[in-house]
Amino acid sequence: MASRSHTEVRFKFGQNWQRFLSSVNEQRVLAAEKALTTVLGNIRGKTFLDAGCGSGLSSLAAHRLGAHVAAFDYDTQSVACTKELQRCHGLSWRTEEGSVLDANYLTKLGQFDIVSSWGVLHHTGKMYEAFRNIAIPVKPGGLLFISIYNDQGFLSLYWKVVKRIYNTGWFGRVFMTLIHLPYVGGRFVVRKITRRPIERGMSLWVDYIDWLGGYPFEVAKPRDVIEFFAGLGFTVVKTNLVGGSLVGRRSGNNEFVFRKNHDQPERHR
């Protein structure tokens, strides 16, 4: 497994997910199932790897949809969250601690019909290394489903500073949370007016804290992501871009579904 540094600045993702667990109900699970089905279609009988399982909600949704699920996360508390979700629903699938930066670990996992890593790779601190490694457990002909923060240029640099300050201690957390409350308040009002649910069964507040604190933090232009994975032997089959185009500058995650070619070229070094 990739080594942990005691001095590294890293958001406590698992701690945030533990707050979310108490709000996981049938409505949220159904929303997560719908999100997976919309993007991936029928996954019944497929092998499914949740790389960076977080709260475990996506793993649970995939399991209920009939997939054979395995899951891992770098964060110990996130692994605990997923196992608690299993216990609460009386279900079981392979869940363990692991790192997408550990190529040997990913090789030992074997290969899967579907590998999902939603909102994970840009938080590793080595995003392009994570891109290379996440290709390992995808079967030839299999699907890779990822989401990556959109590159907003200067605004992305601003958010990186915000996240770095947030993770300096309690004062940074309180200060950054308070001065950005209008950001989440505006989103809350819009959703109340439009009655639009939170995507993927998530919580607006948990997403807000994850956005403010999520560090390490990297971004990429959609075209760069597509071209990089093409070099790894993948063909893009579906995108959902926050800017609506390959050059959009809105904030949020760009979603990509890639298919691994049977005759893929040599991997990037």
Can you say where each PLM-predicted feature lies in the sequence?
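Conserved class I S-adenosyl-L-methionine
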Residues: 46-52, 143-184
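A short glycine-rich, Lys/Arg-flanked "PGG" loop and its adjoining helix->strand segment in the class I
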Residues: 128-140
